[in-house]
Amino acid sequence: MTARVAIVTGASSGIGLGITRALLERGYRVVANSRTISDSKDLQPSASLVLVDGDIAKKETATKVAAAAVQHFERIDLLVNNAGIYLPKPFTDYTPEDFERMIGTNVAGYFFVTQQAVAHMRKQKSGHVVGISTTVTDQPLAGAHISLPVLTKSTVPAFNRALAMEYVADGIRANTISPGVVDTPMHANADHEALKKLHPIPRLVQISEIVDALLYLESAPMVNGENIRIDGGAHAGAKW
C-alpha cells in the first residue's frame, strides 16, 4: 500500500509538531513547514520527512511547500492547515501592522497553500484538506480581547464547507478541527487553573485529542464539510 503524503504548516511546535510526529509514526510521508523549521531540534529530515522553511503567508512559500511534496513523494494526500497566530488586544488598539500580520498568517497562509495543494489533488482525483480553527469563534468571551483573532479564524469552517462542495466531484474532502484552549507552551503553567474553567469539562485540551480527531477524519471518507469541536462542550452554551 502506498504511503499517504501530508503537508503540515506551523509544524515546528505545539499542535503542528504533535500532528507531524503522529503522522510519521503511522507511516505517512510528511512535508513540514514553519518559518525556520530547519533549525528545529524536534524534527530531523529523513526519507519520510522534508522540512521547508518560509513564511506560509507568502505565495512563494506555499508554492515551495507543495512542490517539495510532489518532488520528493509524487503526490499530496493530506494538507493540514495548522499555522496561525493569536494576538489578543482590545479591538480599538489593533494597528494596521497587527491586522496585516494576522490576516497574513491566518488567512493568506491558508489560502495560498490550499490553492497549491488542491491543484495537485485534482490531478489525483483525491485529497483531504483539514484546517485548525478554534471554538472561540462560536462562543466569544467577555473581556478576552479576541475580535481580530475571531475575524481571521472564523473563516476556516465556512471556507472548508465551501471547498468541500466545490471539489467533492474531484474526490477532495475538506474538514475543520476547532479546539478550545490547548495545553501547549503558549500558555504559562500559572494560567492553567483559570484556563481550565473556560471548558465545561474543566481541563485543557490535549494535543493528542486533536491528533485523534485528525486520524478519525482521515479514516472516515463520508465525513466532508464537518467541524469537529474539542472544547468540553464550551461551544454548546455560555454558562456552566
How should each PLM-predicted stretch be described?
Residues P90-F91, D98-E100, L195:
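Substrate-binding pocket helix/loop in short-chain dehydrogenase/reductase
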Residues T114-Q115, R161:
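A short, exposed helix-loop element centered on a Lys and neighboring polar residues
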Residues V130-T155, N160-R161, M165-A169:
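Catalytic loop of short-chain dehydrogenase/reductase
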Residues F111, I207-I230, H235:
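C-terminal substrate-recognition "lid" of short-chain dehydrogenase/reductases
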Residues S12-S13:
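Conserved glycine-rich cofactor-binding loop
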Residues R4, R75-I76, M121-T134, A169-I172, ...:
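Active-site loop of short-chain dehydrogenase/reductase
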Residues R75-D77, P157-N160, A164-V182, V223-I230:
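Conserved Rossmann-fold SDR core element
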